[in-house]
Protein backbone atom coordinates (compact mmCIF):
# COMPACT_ATOMS: atom_id res chain seq x y z
CA UNK A 1 0.00 0.00 0.00
CA UNK A 2 1.30 3.45 -0.92
CA UNK A 3 1.88 5.97 1.82
CA UNK A 4 0.05 9.29 1.51
CA UNK A 5 3.19 11.19 0.39
CA UNK A 6 3.87 8.67 -2.39
CA UNK A 7 0.30 9.04 -3.67
CA UNK A 8 0.86 12.78 -4.12
CA UNK A 9 4.34 12.53 -5.63
CA UNK A 10 4.06 9.53 -7.95
CA UNK A 11 2.04 10.22 -11.08
CA UNK A 12 2.29 8.09 -14.18
CA UNK A 13 2.86 9.68 -17.56
CA UNK A 14 -0.65 8.73 -18.66
CA UNK A 15 -2.13 10.35 -15.56
CA UNK A 16 -0.18 13.54 -16.25
CA UNK A 17 -1.54 13.54 -19.81
CA UNK A 18 -5.11 13.12 -18.53
CA UNK A 19 -4.57 15.88 -15.94
CA UNK A 20 -3.24 18.23 -18.64
CA UNK A 21 -6.03 17.47 -21.10
CA UNK A 22 -8.76 18.02 -18.49
CA UNK A 23 -7.07 21.25 -17.39
CA UNK A 24 -6.77 22.57 -20.94
CA UNK A 25 -10.41 21.71 -21.75
CA UNK A 26 -11.39 23.87 -18.78
CA UNK A 27 -9.09 26.65 -20.01
CA UNK A 28 -10.69 26.55 -23.46
CA UNK A 29 -14.17 26.81 -21.94
CA UNK A 30 -13.17 29.65 -19.60
CA UNK A 31 -11.34 31.50 -22.36
CA UNK A 32 -14.41 31.33 -24.59
CA UNK A 33 -16.57 32.64 -21.73
CA UNK A 34 -14.19 35.56 -21.15
CA UNK A 35 -14.19 36.36 -24.88
CA UNK A 36 -18.00 36.50 -24.77
CA UNK A 37 -17.67 39.77 -22.81
CA UNK A 38 -15.00 41.31 -25.06
CA UNK A 39 -15.83 43.03 -28.35
CA UNK A 40 -14.02 41.11 -31.09
CA UNK A 41 -14.05 39.72 -34.58
CA UNK A 42 -12.98 36.16 -35.28
CA UNK A 43 -13.43 32.77 -33.65
CA UNK A 44 -12.70 32.65 -29.89
CA UNK A 45 -12.91 28.83 -29.81
CA UNK A 46 -10.17 28.50 -32.43
CA UNK A 47 -8.07 31.07 -30.53
CA UNK A 48 -8.48 29.17 -27.26
CA UNK A 49 -7.55 25.83 -28.86
CA UNK A 50 -4.42 27.44 -30.31
CA UNK A 51 -3.58 28.95 -26.91
CA UNK A 52 -4.16 25.61 -25.23
CA UNK A 53 -1.76 23.85 -27.58
CA UNK A 54 0.79 26.65 -27.24
CA UNK A 55 0.47 26.57 -23.45
CA UNK A 56 1.14 22.84 -23.29
CA UNK A 57 4.26 23.17 -25.43
CA UNK A 58 5.36 26.31 -23.57
CA UNK A 59 4.81 24.59 -20.20
CA UNK A 60 7.11 21.74 -21.22
CA UNK A 61 9.82 24.00 -22.68
CA UNK A 62 9.72 26.66 -19.97
CA UNK A 63 9.79 24.19 -17.08
CA UNK A 64 12.63 22.23 -18.66
CA UNK A 65 14.70 25.42 -19.03
CA UNK A 66 13.72 26.70 -15.57
CA UNK A 67 14.70 23.39 -13.96
CA UNK A 68 18.10 23.60 -15.67
CA UNK A 69 18.64 27.18 -14.48
CA UNK A 70 17.28 26.54 -10.97
CA UNK A 71 18.48 23.03 -10.09
CA UNK A 72 17.83 21.25 -6.84
CA UNK A 73 14.90 19.86 -4.93
CA UNK A 74 11.70 21.21 -6.48
CA UNK A 75 9.79 20.61 -3.26
CA UNK A 76 12.22 22.92 -1.44
CA UNK A 77 11.47 25.89 -3.70
CA UNK A 78 10.10 28.69 -1.59
CA UNK A 79 7.56 31.39 -2.36
CA UNK A 80 10.08 33.73 -4.01
CA UNK A 81 11.28 31.13 -6.54
CA UNK A 82 7.69 30.02 -7.20
CA UNK A 83 6.57 33.62 -7.72
CA UNK A 84 9.47 34.30 -10.11
CA UNK A 85 8.58 31.09 -11.95
CA UNK A 86 4.91 32.05 -12.33
CA UNK A 87 5.59 35.65 -13.38
CA UNK A 88 8.22 34.62 -15.94
CA UNK A 89 6.01 31.86 -17.31
CA UNK A 90 2.97 34.09 -17.79
CA UNK A 91 4.90 37.19 -18.86
CA UNK A 92 6.84 35.38 -21.55
CA UNK A 93 3.71 33.56 -22.69
CA UNK A 94 1.93 36.91 -23.09
CA UNK A 95 4.69 38.10 -25.44
CA UNK A 96 3.47 35.39 -27.82
CA UNK A 97 -0.26 35.57 -27.12
CA UNK A 98 -0.94 39.31 -27.38
CA UNK A 99 0.05 39.51 -31.08
CA UNK A 100 -2.00 36.38 -31.79
CA UNK A 101 -5.06 37.94 -30.13
CA UNK A 102 -4.48 41.15 -32.09
CA UNK A 103 -4.35 39.28 -35.38
CA UNK A 104 -7.07 36.67 -34.87
CA UNK A 105 -9.58 38.88 -33.06
CA UNK A 106 -8.74 42.05 -35.02
CA UNK A 107 -8.03 44.06 -31.87
CA UNK A 108 -5.76 46.95 -31.07
CA UNK A 109 -2.64 46.25 -29.01
CA UNK A 110 -4.21 47.79 -25.91
CA UNK A 111 -7.46 45.79 -26.22
CA UNK A 112 -5.54 42.55 -26.88
CA UNK A 113 -3.23 43.26 -23.93
CA UNK A 114 -6.16 43.92 -21.56
CA UNK A 115 -7.97 40.83 -22.86
CA UNK A 116 -4.87 38.71 -22.26
CA UNK A 117 -4.40 40.09 -18.74
CA UNK A 118 -8.06 39.39 -17.96
CA UNK A 119 -7.80 35.83 -19.26
CA UNK A 120 -4.54 35.30 -17.36
CA UNK A 121 -6.08 36.45 -14.07
CA UNK A 122 -9.19 34.32 -14.56
CA UNK A 123 -7.09 31.29 -15.54
CA UNK A 124 -4.88 31.89 -12.49
CA UNK A 125 -7.91 31.46 -10.22
CA UNK A 126 -9.06 28.45 -12.22
CA UNK A 127 -5.59 26.88 -11.97
CA UNK A 128 -5.62 27.17 -8.18
CA UNK A 129 -9.10 25.63 -7.88
CA UNK A 130 -8.50 22.96 -10.54
CA UNK A 131 -5.31 21.66 -8.94
CA UNK A 132 -6.84 21.73 -5.46
CA UNK A 133 -9.86 19.73 -6.65
CA UNK A 134 -7.76 17.41 -8.84
CA UNK A 135 -5.36 16.55 -6.00
CA UNK A 136 -8.23 15.68 -3.67
CA UNK A 137 -10.14 13.72 -6.30
CA UNK A 138 -6.94 11.92 -7.29
CA UNK A 139 -6.30 10.91 -3.70
CA UNK A 140 -9.81 9.47 -3.51
CA UNK A 141 -9.46 7.48 -6.75
CA UNK A 142 -5.87 6.31 -6.16
CA UNK A 143 -6.71 5.00 -2.71
CA UNK A 144 -9.88 3.27 -4.00
Positions of predicted regions on the chain:
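Juxtamembrane/disordered regions of integral membrane proteins
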Residues: 4-144
